[in-house]
Amino acid sequence: MSAVGPGSNAGASVNGGSATAIATLLRNHKELKQRQGLFQAKQTDFFRYKRFVRALHSEEYANKSARQPEIYPTIPSNKIEDQLKSREIFIQLIKAQMVIPVKKLHSQECKEHGLKPSKDFPHLIVSNKAQLEADEYFVWNYNPRTYMDYLIVIGVVSIILALVCYPLWPRSMRRGSYYVSLGAFGILAGFFAVAILRLILYVLSLIVYKDVGGFWIFPNLFEDCGVLESFKPLYGFGEKDTYSYKKKLKRMKKKQAKRESNKKKAINEKAEQN
């Protein structure tokens, strides 16, 4: 079993600048097949070590390595040397704190660590020792800046400057901004009016449809879903017709199908052993 400890030796060929360049290249690489997990109460990308090794064998990395071997070390064709070089690169990323070894927790383990299990994202905690095994998990602690980040900064600064210079705007622009703000307030007021009307209709309908639940119409602004999903379905009775309830049923069906599939696999494995 390979482990990274204080006594591990990384080759001199992979320095800090090289580690940063490699991390930038592979940060969002498709070979990593990254997933989202909750690490220190934040959504973070995590991946398996074997996926990182595959990314090092990708065409993108090979092209960079051919042009700049001093920054992107060449991966040897020999299997043993290949493993050593991959380990060397990854150890340097760990030492630079660009990747952090983690352990993925199951529901019961979450409760033991005082964490609330999440249906959408698995919880991750720091692993005391980085085991460079194929299925060990790691999270990124490195997020290179993208062109979109720069565009957002420029956009925010431009908006602030435009608002500060509002008194200098031409009369036509100020009149236009006035009508735009009125339109925005109108839309907001419309949403509140629909929500109030929906509530009144629901309460009144409870008298007639008490057994099945009150009658409601779209949109459900308080549903945990997107804008379009809040209009689906257009109307219904009680909780069973709501978007969240139907989504819950789908999740339960998927879990049930997965359990049955696992049972069949277990039965087949036992049959093969016998």
UniProtKB/Swiss-Prot annotation:
One Pfam family linked to the record: Sec62
Main subcellular localisation: endoplasmic reticulum
One GO term describing the cellular component: Sec62/Sec63 complex
Membrane-crossing residue ranges in chain numbering: 150-169, 184-204
GO molecular function list: protein transmembrane transporter activity
Topology class, membrane: Multi-pass membrane protein
Biased composition (Basic residues): 251-265
Localization: Endoplasmic reticulum membrane
Location of N-acetylserine modifications: S2
Listed InterPro entries: Sec62, Sec62_asco
Topology, Cytoplasmic side: 2-149, 205-274
Region: Disordered, residue numbers: 251-274
Record-level GO BP terms: post-translational protein targeting to membrane, translocation
Entry keywords, A to Z: Acetylation, Endoplasmic reticulum, Membrane, Protein transport, Translocation, Transmembrane, Transmembrane helix, Transport
Lumenal compartment segments: 170-183
General function of this protein: Acts as a component of the Sec62/63 complex which is involved in SRP-independent post-translational translocation across the endoplasmic reticulum (ER) and functions together with the Sec61 complex and KAR2 in a channel-forming translocon complex. In an initial step, the signal sequence seems to bind simultaneously to SEC61 and SEC62. SEC62 and SEC63 are required for interactions between SEC61 and translocating polypeptides.
Quaternary context: Component of the heterotetrameric Sec62/63complex composed of SEC62, SEC63, SEC71 and SEC72. The Sec62/63 complex associates with the Sec61 complex to form the Sec complex.
Similarity comment: family membership: Belongs to the SEC62 family.
Additional comment: Present with 16500 molecules/cell in log phase SD medium.
Protein known as: Translocation protein SEC62
Organism this protein belongs to: Saccharomyces cerevisiae (strain ATCC 204508 / S288c) (Baker's yeast)
Gene designation per UniProt: SEC62
